[in-house]
A protein has these predicted regions:
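Bacterial N-terminal signal peptides that target proteins for export
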Residues: 1-8
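Sterically constrained small-residue positions within well-ordered secondary structures
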Residues: 11-14, 61
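C-terminal segment of classical bacterial N-terminal signal peptides
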Residues: 13-21
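Aromatic- and Gly/Pro-enriched helix-to-coil junctions and flexible linker segments
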Residues: 23-158
Length: 158
């Protein structure tokens, strides 16, 4: 039993130090683009509409299993910072930040819960430890708009 606890402690220690290193080193090219290419490109790749085209004909594109194009750094950060502030965070979130309800794209981050959590942690590290904010540019309902101070916490290193 003692060996089991020692092993569990070692795993947690390595996981913690690995997450810290990832938080400092996560970049679009090295970490996010490979996940995107594997998990997201089929619906959000080069054949998808840009954000404005998608918003103009959302039902048509959703019926064709196409979301807004995010296959470049520039396209992806439009769904993080502006004009669709927080969209990536809201859709990929596991629900721990949204009252227990995961975002509608969380399920596509991996085929197992472990893979989904690993990929989510990579996205969170890339956005920044304090930048994973689910707010929008404008207030909606009882959720206030994102503040300049909160926007300043978004990192998204290329």
């Amino acid at each position: 039993m003692r060996k089991l606890w020692a092993a569990a402690g070692a795993v947690l220690w390595f996981a913690g130090t690995g997450a810290g290193a990832l938080a400092q080193d996560a970049t679009y090219r090295k970490d996010i683009k490979p996940i995107f290419d594997q998990k997201c490109a089929a619906c959000h790749g080069a054949a998808s509409p840009n954000l404005q085209e998608f918003l103009e004909n959302q039902k048509k594109f959703e019926a064709a299993m196409k979301g807004p194009r995010m296959d470049s750094y520039a396209d992806l950060i439009m769904l993080i910072g502006w004009p669709d502030t927080g969209a990536v965070m809201r859709r990929l979130d596991d629900g721990k930040n949204a009252g227990g309800k995961p975002g509608n794209m969380y399920q596509y981050l991996g085929s197992t819960d472990e893979e989904r959590q690993k990929n989510l942690l990579t996205f969170k590290a890339w956005v920044g430890p304090e930048g994973w904010i689910l707010k929008r540019w404008n207030a909606r309902g009882n959720v206030p708009a994102i503040t300049k101070e909160e926007l300043d916490k978004i990192r998204v290193k290329y």
